Protein backbone atom coordinates (compact mmCIF):
# COMPACT_ATOMS: atom_id res chain seq x y z
CA UNK A 1 0.00 0.00 0.00
CA UNK A 2 1.34 3.42 -0.95
CA UNK A 3 2.13 5.88 1.81
CA UNK A 4 0.27 9.18 2.01
CA UNK A 5 2.13 12.47 1.72
CA UNK A 6 1.60 13.03 5.45
CA UNK A 7 3.06 9.62 6.35
CA UNK A 8 6.11 10.27 4.19
CA UNK A 9 6.65 13.74 5.66
CA UNK A 10 6.11 12.58 9.24
CA UNK A 11 8.64 9.79 8.89
CA UNK A 12 11.07 12.19 7.22
CA UNK A 13 10.77 14.62 10.13
CA UNK A 14 11.39 11.85 12.65
CA UNK A 15 14.35 10.47 10.71
CA UNK A 16 16.03 13.80 10.05
CA UNK A 17 15.51 15.30 13.51
CA UNK A 18 16.73 12.10 15.14
CA UNK A 19 19.91 12.23 13.07
CA UNK A 20 20.47 15.74 14.47
CA UNK A 21 19.88 14.50 18.02
CA UNK A 22 16.71 16.53 18.46
CA UNK A 23 14.81 13.54 19.88
CA UNK A 24 16.43 14.03 23.31
CA UNK A 25 15.57 16.53 26.01
CA UNK A 26 11.86 17.05 25.47
CA UNK A 27 9.99 17.90 28.68
CA UNK A 28 7.08 15.75 27.52
CA UNK A 29 9.42 12.96 26.41
CA UNK A 30 9.01 10.94 23.26
CA UNK A 31 5.39 12.03 22.80
CA UNK A 32 6.46 15.67 22.66
CA UNK A 33 9.07 14.97 20.01
CA UNK A 34 6.58 12.97 17.94
CA UNK A 35 3.99 15.76 18.22
CA UNK A 36 6.64 18.28 17.09
CA UNK A 37 7.43 16.11 14.07
CA UNK A 38 3.76 15.63 13.22
CA UNK A 39 3.03 19.38 13.40
CA UNK A 40 5.98 20.21 11.17
CA UNK A 41 5.10 17.41 8.75
CA UNK A 42 1.65 18.96 8.29
CA UNK A 43 3.20 22.31 7.42
CA UNK A 44 5.78 20.68 5.14
CA UNK A 45 3.10 18.87 3.13
CA UNK A 46 0.91 21.98 2.82
CA UNK A 47 3.78 24.19 1.68
CA UNK A 48 5.39 21.57 -0.55
CA UNK A 49 2.20 20.88 -2.51
CA UNK A 50 1.71 24.61 -3.23
CA UNK A 51 4.79 24.77 -5.44
CA UNK A 52 6.05 21.24 -6.10
CA UNK A 53 4.66 17.86 -7.15
CA UNK A 54 3.92 15.31 -4.40
CA UNK A 55 6.78 13.42 -2.78
CA UNK A 56 7.74 10.46 -4.96
CA UNK A 57 9.03 8.24 -2.15
CA UNK A 58 10.57 8.30 1.32
CA UNK A 59 13.98 9.38 0.04
CA UNK A 60 12.41 12.39 -1.69
CA UNK A 61 10.56 13.39 1.48
CA UNK A 62 13.72 12.95 3.56
CA UNK A 63 15.68 15.13 1.16
CA UNK A 64 13.12 17.96 1.32
CA UNK A 65 12.95 17.87 5.12
CA UNK A 66 16.75 17.75 5.43
CA UNK A 67 16.95 20.73 3.08
CA UNK A 68 14.41 22.61 5.20
CA UNK A 69 16.33 21.83 8.37
CA UNK A 70 19.50 23.38 6.95
CA UNK A 71 17.76 26.73 7.42
CA UNK A 72 17.08 25.91 11.08
CA UNK A 73 20.53 24.73 12.15
CA UNK A 74 23.61 26.95 12.49
Protein language model regions, located:
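C-terminal alpha-helical interaction appendages
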Residues: 1-74
Amino acid sequence: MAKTQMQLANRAWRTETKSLGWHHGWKTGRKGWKAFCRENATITVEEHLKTDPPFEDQADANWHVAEELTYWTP
